[in-house]
Amino acid sequence: MTNVKTSSLGFPRIGLNREWKKSLEAYWKGNTDRETFLKEMDEQFLAALQTQLDQQIDIIPVSDFTMYDHVLDTAVMFNWIPDRFKDINDPLDTYFAMARGTKDAVSSEMTKWFNTNYHYIVPEYEKGAQYRVTRNKPLQDYQRAKAALGTETKPVILGLYTFVALAKGYEQQDIKDIYNQMTPLYIQVLKELEQEGVKWVQIDEPALVTASPEEAAAVKEIYQTITEEVSELNILLQTYFDSVDAYEELISFPVAGIGLDFVHDKGKNFEHLKAHGFPKDKVLAAGILDGRNIWKANLEERLDLTLELIQRAGVDEVWIQPSNSLLHVPVAKHPGEHLADDLLNGLSFAKEKLLELTLLKNGLVSGKAAIQAEIDEAHGHLQDLKQYGAATNSAFAEERGKLTEEDFKRPTAFEERLRIQNDSLGLPLLPTTTIGSFPQTADVRSARQKWRKKEWSDEQYEAFIQEETKKWIDIQEDLGLDVLVHGEFERTDMVEYFGEKLGGFAFTKYAWVQSYGSRCVRPPVIYGDVEFKEPMTVKETVYAQSLTSKKVKGMLTGPVTILNWSFARYDLPRKEIAFQIACALRKEVEALEKAGIQIIQVDEPALREGLPLKERDWDEYLKWAAEAFRLSTSSVEDTTQIHTHMCYSNFEDIVDAIEDLDADVITIEHSRSHGGFLDYLEQHPYLKGLGLGVYDIHSPRVPSSDEMLTIIEDALKVCPADRFWVNPDCGLKTRQPEETIAALKNMVEAAKQARGKLAQTV
């Protein structure tokens, strides 16, 4: 008889009411002292554990909780602290400086965590650095949990292979030296856990899903060394987000258990298990519930899958768990949520997913009959959800059938469009602009709340938005920016705003997830066909344009980003959902153009994050992603300039796809890449319009004009000056007005100096 246990890989940090976010931001602003802040963090750490205990989960993780980011935690634990922060003597100040920067030191780079919408702080390797264990965070967290709750937990550590794969600053020939230097440090951390009496530790190695057999063999040597030194501690080697290509090598690792994703593996992990078996002396930790989407599980289907897994594996012990950490879904259904019952009953957040695991364990141990009532209830809820979505599933089929090849491309080549647009727009060399949003101050947020609570009328709220828009149009003109934006004061979120105005979307009030640091988002829920209802941005954009003789950009979010930043329906291919969104946006683009807007920006910051983890799957995704963008934008006249924006990505992977978008101008987050993208452009020139961010908007630091001039001049060594734009990294929504104005003033001055130097060379 196989012993079945429930396990959690990780739990959301932010709290049901975003208590974590509020504590962080109050501390950063100086509104709470350190003692209060640390006390609040400890309370939230314990609350997350208690929630998992309350769902009767057998094996609960610790050390997944963090004060900013778990990758940053790992870097700091092993003293991967860049030299520019070494003069900061306080450990907590150093930690936050690496994440957020200081007036003297730029923050570490931030990028996507695999193909999710979570962002991690990129570890920086520095040759000759003395790495050491600064503190054993997993041990401290284990001790805190045991002392406060009296329970055994499973410390979670980011594995060495994945940590190095996520880092930057090293050459290929450095990797062996890094492993040799870091392996004893991992052993030290694990040895201390072993001495404390810890029974299990979860070592996360998601990067192993893309490892070749040769790479996996090298990683196996690391674990051989570790387990020889730490023989009494049970190690669970955890993978997720896809299947493991080097499966045969993986199952030979000298560890006590292996975690596999049986949700996002496209069936491959199960195929591997059936073909090659599973070691009888290891625990199989089976990811059977979707940890990245919010739909209620089909309990009967999941039960049948798990029974077959148990039968095929033939092991003594199986852990059933989510496919990955529940970091990527909301904490729990909030009692104040306002969704229709048929939709709400079809959803399952982190807390509910753990309850589903407990139900499944009961079914596995006591038989299906023991949970038949719950199976029937879940089936009924899923049927109700399907019927709820079906109410919108009518309009798109006819429109999809009418699409032709011509709808997916602009009729005129870029070089000719560039000539026409240069004549039409009359912009200076190195035009300056921003990415779209301006600071959403307390006044802006308060006005929105008053409007939503019906304390303000629509007319009052619109008057306020127009007042803010006019204020920032005037500020932009005073600063000397060349292409202006209306500021997006009416928008809470760049996806939510559009989804609220399109058919097929639903929005929650409390279903928050962490994006980066304290930044939380409420992803829309796509439950039916997406449908254009009426213009969404025309009124605000046209009003802004009426206030200035300079060009004002229309600002839209692209179809792939809306898809990737939403919880998407599970009954349609993602490509088809993207095309539905694209058709709706196409109508909005046409409405903006008809209203006289000559520059329209369709942002795709999330294009790369949807990239499959395995390179062999990239072409298919990138093909339809580019098609969806072009479907949104290709119906405009040659005089209309299409911009797009991307952020937080390794762009080298997708340059061909960026070219395939056929946008006239692309602006890209650049300042945190520390010059890496320029090195790529030197070898692979990009000849369409390009704006590389000249300062980091995620940090309160205001860089000097000289710093920005250096970035511009470096960029002009590899980018044609006649098609280069000057802009910040991203939107300025989260910054304060004073620092925004100061930074933009320096940016405009840097552009003027660069133009002057170019004029002298002509």
Swiss-Prot record:
Binding positions for 5-methyltetrahydropteroyltri-L-glutamate per the UniProt entry: R18, E19, W20, K21, K112, R519, C520, W565, E609
Cofactor note: Binds 1 zinc ion per subunit.
InterPro entries for the chain: Cbl-indep_Met_Synth_N, Cobalamin-indep_Met_synthase, Met_Synth_C/arc, UROD/MetE-like_sf
Pathway noted in the entry: Amino-acid biosynthesis; L-methionine biosynthesis via de novo pathway; L-methionine from L-homocysteine (MetE route): step 1/1
Enzyme class: transferase
Listed GO MF terms: 5-methyltetrahydropteroyltriglutamate-homocysteine S-methyltransferase activity; zinc ion binding
Active site location: H698 (proton donor)
NCBIfam families the UniProt entry points to: met_syn_B12ind (TIGR01371), PRK05222.1 (NF003556)
Function per UniProt: Catalyzes the transfer of a methyl group from 5-methyltetrahydrofolate to homocysteine resulting in methionine formation.
Protein name as annotated: 5-methyltetrahydropteroyltriglutamate--homocysteine methyltransferase
Organism from which the protein derives: Bacillus licheniformis (strain ATCC 14580 / DSM 13 / JCM 2505 / CCUG 7422 / NBRC 12200 / NCIMB 9375 / NCTC 10341 / NRRL NRS-1264 / Gibson 46)
